[in-house]
């Protein structure tokens, strides 16, 4: 990964106006933030800049307002939570450009923190419109991007600003990039990837990229059924994309060419209905009843997955192994996650995980603090796993 500048490269920023792109796209119900994780992740960058005397000006999007103001998507509603997390007063401007923003910035003292209104209230944000970028840049001397989760978008506040102002990575961005470099950029081998989830169709690029980079690819979740069916296994009524059999075969051929082992379930936990406490049984993967569906990988498969994790120096994980939301179909995901956490805590494994369902599954297993790094970035994490260039990251390595 090319070098990029971080906050460590910033000298004497007292009095400087620092535009900080953060991810504050948090879930809100009845006007209250229900999960402040994303705010907590960017707090260190904000507070470090403030403590050094910078005038910290926060840029963020919230929801999809489609280029015009929508009251329910105003960032004003999250100000109290941001203040609670930072333990620091913040002011709010009713626009991210124009007089409201300029006036609010002009009133700032050194160390103050200002949140500007939702950047997506303007069409220029998602279009990366040069005129809009210039209006944003007018309020800053320095640009810091701490929103890896939005780095796959070439928007005005994530990519355009880095062309106008000296650009640096914030602490969250820095930690994410360093963790991802350990995961797939320059990993210690052997590297094992676990990919689960419902559908192959949403992860074709990811799987094709991984088989060229990892030593073993463990496939679980509903997508394993598509690979099993492509191999000639009868998967009963299991979720399966039969029309992607040829794609699955191509991925397996590419894996063989690249020297990547494909690890598929040897047994499964099957049920006739997908409900909590449904009657279920463990069957060999070649003996799935015609009227049943596989909802989790079985204990023999779990032991195999744990053995692969034990052999690995690096683990990259995206997607659960089974329908973890409903017991007892969470057993395999929990067992594998706990084993990976134990190996990580023992200093034997670098473990990097990401993706919405993955984060939820690892939280469910109670091990989210025990992995080397868990990305909350969603789409950006997936595009990184697919081997795609992320505009918001690429510009940091070439910015003036």
UniProtKB/Swiss-Prot annotation:
Annotated residues for binding of substrate = 23-25, 38, 61-64, 120, 153
Task: Give the record's keywords alphabetically.
Answer: ATP-binding, Cytoplasm, Glycolysis, Kinase, Nucleotide-binding, Transferase
**Catalyzed reaction equations:** (2R)-3-phosphoglycerate + ATP = (2R)-3-phospho-glyceroyl phosphate + ADP
GO cellular component, alphabetical, reads: cytosol
Q: What is its EC number?
A: 2.7.2.3
Query: Could you list the residue ranges forming a coiled coil in this record?
Result: none
Pfam families noted in UniProt: PGK
The family database entries (InterPro entries) matched by this protein are listed as: Phosphoglycerate_kinase (IPR001576), Phosphoglycerate_kinase_CS (IPR015911), Phosphoglycerate_kinase_N (IPR015824), Phosphoglycerate_kinase_sf (IPR036043)
Q: Which GO terms describe its molecular function?
A: ADP binding; ATP binding; phosphoglycerate kinase activity
Q: What is its main location?
A: cytoplasm
A GO BP term here is: glycolytic process
Q: Where in the cell is it found?
A: Cytoplasm
The UniProt annotation places ATP binding at: 203, 325, 355-358
Protein origin, superkingdom: Bacteria
Hey, which pathway is this one from? Carbohydrate degradation; glycolysis; pyruvate from D-glyceraldehyde 3-phosphate: step 2/5
Report the top EC class in one word.
Answer: transferase
What family does this chain come from, according to its entry? Answer: Belongs to the phosphoglycerate kinase family.
Q: How does this protein assemble?
A: Monomer.
Q: What is this protein called?
A: Phosphoglycerate kinase
Its organism's taxonomic lineage begins at: Bacteria, Pseudomonadati, Pseudomonadota, Alphaproteobacteria, Hyphomicrobiales
Q: Which gene encodes it?
A: pgk
């Amino acid at each position: 990964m090319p070098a990029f500048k971080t906050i460590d490269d910033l000298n004497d920023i007292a009095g400087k106006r620092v535009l900080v792109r953060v991810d504050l796209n948090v879930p809100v119900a009845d006007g209250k933030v229900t999960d402040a994780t994303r705010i907590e992740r960017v707090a260190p960058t904000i507070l470090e800049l403030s403590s050094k005397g910078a005038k910290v000006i926060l840029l963020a999007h919230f929801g999809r307002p489609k280029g015009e103001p929508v009251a329910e998507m105003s960032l004003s509603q999250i100000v109290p939570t941001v203040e609670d997390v930072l333990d620091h007063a913040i002011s709010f401007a009713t626009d991210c450009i124009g007089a409201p923003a300029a006036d609010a910035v002009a009133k700032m003292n050194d160390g103050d923190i200002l949140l500007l209104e939702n950047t997506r209230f303007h069409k220029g944000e998602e279009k990366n419109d040069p005129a809009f970028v210039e209006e944003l840049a007018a309020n800053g001397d320095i640009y810091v991007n701490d929103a890896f989760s939005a780095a796959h978008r070439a928007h005005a506040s994530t990519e355009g600003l880095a062309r106008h102002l000296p650009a640096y990575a914030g602490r969250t961005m820095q930690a994410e990039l360093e963790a991802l470099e350990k995961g797939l950029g320059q990993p210690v081998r052997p590297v094992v990837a676990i990919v689960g989830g419902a559908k192959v169709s949403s992860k074709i690029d990811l799987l094709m990229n991984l088989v060229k980079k990892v030593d073993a690819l463990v496939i679980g979740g509903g997508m394993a059924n598509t690979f099993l069916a492509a191999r000639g296994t009868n998967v009963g009524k299991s979720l399966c994309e039969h029309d992607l059999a040829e794609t699955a075969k191509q991925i397996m051929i590419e894996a063989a060419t690249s020297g990547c082992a494909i690890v598929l379930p040897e047994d499964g936990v099957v049920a006739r209905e997908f409900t909590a406490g449904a009657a279920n049984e463990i069957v060999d993967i070649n003996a799935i009843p015609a009227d049943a569906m596989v909802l989790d990988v079985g204990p023999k498969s779990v032991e195999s997955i744990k053995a692969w994790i034990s052999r690995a120096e690096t683990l990259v994980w995206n997607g659960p192994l089974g329908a973890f939301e409903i017991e007892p179909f969470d057993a395999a995901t929990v067992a594998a996650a706990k084993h990976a956490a134990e190996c990580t805590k023992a200093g034997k494994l670098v473990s990097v995980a990401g993706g919405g369902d993955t984060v939820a599954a690892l939280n469910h297993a109670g091990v989210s603090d025990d992995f080397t790094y868990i990305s909350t970035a969603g789409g950006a994490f997936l595009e990184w796993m697919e081997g795609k260039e992320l505009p918001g990251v690429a510009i940091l390595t070439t910015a003036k």
